[in-house]
Structure formats: structure tokens, C-alpha cells
């Protein structure tokens, strides 16, 4: 447990596969496999792939529903404090549980779950660097079937505040205060040539940093100096406050994590993102 405490203290976000191979039985592993596709349904989860083979002891998380507000009109809106605590408890996550999440989708979905955990104050939450691919590439075994977690005892406390996620009103205030807005979607969506909302385009003044541009081919994040170079080349000032958005507040967390890995202060993520902004009549949009 001493080494477990050490990794909590010194690691920022990413857990290397070599460490996890030794300590996977001492953490709560979350398998967040799924995808965002251009077809319908756009948001997909893959429990069947999980059951075919997952990291030993991993619990499946359906990112479309778990840790979300299921009554919200905007898809995958983050759950409120009470619902968050209940979901964490169900998954066996108590106040002191170390969590490591992974997926097979460039760790975008795992990163979203970790962002939510940390935003609600559960800072002992990390992403497996390279995700499922890194584990299998290292020759490490998977196990089939479904792991049913024991609820956490005592239950996870209800958070008293959230930091790192904002709603529509918070986004408007951030813009009024001059925050940098970063659009994590692909260039075609940013320019307005493609949209998954009623309206196309981007939030006026937003800089475009597609989240994939910050990842290596194997799904790992680029090195900090490379991240700084990519972000600055896109016009991002790492010394100023940053708010990131995408379509549903998911890939925006990859950009936000990249900003942190680059050594800058923790950004904020607009939860509703373009799913909300692009479907309203009272929000401005730019094309091109």
C-alpha cells in the first residue's frame, strides 16, 4: 500500500501499464468501452466486448448512463451530487478508493469519467496511459465474464461542490470574462461543414484544437513539450483561463487533460457543449 500512496501523490493523470500490472488488484478498475460514431445511435457502449475480455477485476461503466443526469434533455449531462455519490457507491468507489479507468477509444471516454470524478473532488482517479491497447500490447492477460462490484462501505460521500465543469450560464459568464474557448471537435465540424446539432459552426472566438491532434497513433498523449507546441500553434495561451467544449463534453476532457499535462492550470469543460449550444436559438455561432 505504500507504493499505492506514492503513485497517488506523484502522478498527475496517467498511470503507466507497468505500474498497473503490479497493482490492478489494489484499485477499482473501470472499463469504459464505447464509441461516438457518425451513424445512429451516435453514442454507443460495448458491454459485449467487455464480457469477452477485460482487465482482471474491471467493472463495466456504460458512459452513456452512468454518472449522467438521465432526466436531462441534453445527452450525457453530468449527474448531480447525490446521483454521483450513489453511482460511485454502486461501483464500489468509496472516498479513499483509487480508481483507474480505461477504454478502447483513445481513452476519451475513460478520460471523461476521470474528469467527472475529479470535478466532484475524487482526485485519486487516473487514466491508463494507452488504454486497453497498451495492456494487450504488453502481453498482459484479459479475463472474460462480468464483475459485479460490492457497494462501497461506507458509501461515497455526497460532494459539496463541483469544480471543472460549467453549464450554459457558466459558459456565458466565462465568455463575458474573456476566457479562452477551445473547440475540441474536428475541423469540419468547427468550420460548419458538418454538424450533429440543429445549427452548425462554433462558439464565436473559439480556437480549434481537435482532440486527436494531441494523441499519438497508439492513443497515448503526446509528450508535454509536444502538447505545448501543438496548443500554442493553435493560438492557445497556456497562461490564461481555458474553457473547452466539443459536442457532448466528452472529447473536450481530452483537450483539458492535455492542457494539464502540458503544465498549465486545470481548464474548465462546458458540460452541454455543442449538443446544447448548437440546438438553441439564443446562442451565437460563427462559421468558417
Model-found features: residue ranges?
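Cytosolic catalytic domains that perform sulfur/thiol-centered chemistry
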Residues: 2-288
Amino acid at each position: 500500500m505504500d507504493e499505492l500512496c506514492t503513485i497517488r501523490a506523484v502522478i498527475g493523470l496517467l498511470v503507466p501499464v507497468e505500474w498497473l500490472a503490479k497493482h490492478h488488484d489494489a484499485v477499482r478498475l473501470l472499463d469504459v468501452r464505447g464509441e461516438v460514431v457518425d451513424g445512429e445511435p451516435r453514442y454507443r457502449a460495448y458491454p459485449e466486448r467487455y464480457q469477452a475480455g477485460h482487465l482482471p477485476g474491471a467493472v463495466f461503466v456504460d458512459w452513456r448512463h452512468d454518472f449522467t443526469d438521465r432526466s436531462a434533455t441534453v445527452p450525457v449531462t453530468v449527474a448531480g451530487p447525490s446521483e454521483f455519490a450513489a453511482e460511485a457507491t454502486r461501483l464500489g468507489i468509496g472516498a479513499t478508493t483509487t480508481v483507474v479507468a480505461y477504454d478502447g477509444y483513445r481513452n476519451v471516454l475513460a478520460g471523461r469519467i476521470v474528469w467527472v470524478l475529479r470535478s466532484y473532488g475524487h482526485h485519486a482517479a487516473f487514466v491508463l496511459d494507452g488504454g486497453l491497447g497498451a495492456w494487450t500490447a504488453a502481453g498482459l492477460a484479459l479475463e472474460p465474464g462480468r464483475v459485479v462490484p460490492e457497494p462501497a462501505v461506507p458509501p461515497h460521500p455526497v460532494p459539496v461542490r463541483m469544480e471543472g465543469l460549467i453549464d450554459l450560464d457558466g459558459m456565458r459568464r466565462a465568455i463575458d470574462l474573456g476566457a479562452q474557448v477551445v473547440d475540441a471537435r474536428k475541423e469540419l465540424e468547427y468550420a460548419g461543414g458538418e454538424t450533429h446539432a440543429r445549427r452548425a459552426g462554433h462558439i464565436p472566438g473559439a480556437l480549434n484544437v481537435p482532440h486527436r491532434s494531441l494523441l499519438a497513433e497508439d492513443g497515448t498523449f503526446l509528450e508535454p513539450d509536444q502538447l505545448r507546441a501543438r496548443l500554442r500553434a493553435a493560438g492557445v495561451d497556456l497562461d490564461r483561463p481555458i474553457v473547452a467544449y466539443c459536442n457532448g463534453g466528452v472529447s473536450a476532457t481530452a483537450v483539458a487533460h492535455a492542457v494539464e499535462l502540458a503544465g498549465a492550470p486545470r481548464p474548465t469543460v462546458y458540460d452541454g457543449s455543442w449538443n446544447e449550444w448548437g440546438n438553441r436559438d439564443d446562442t451565437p455561432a460563427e462559421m468558417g
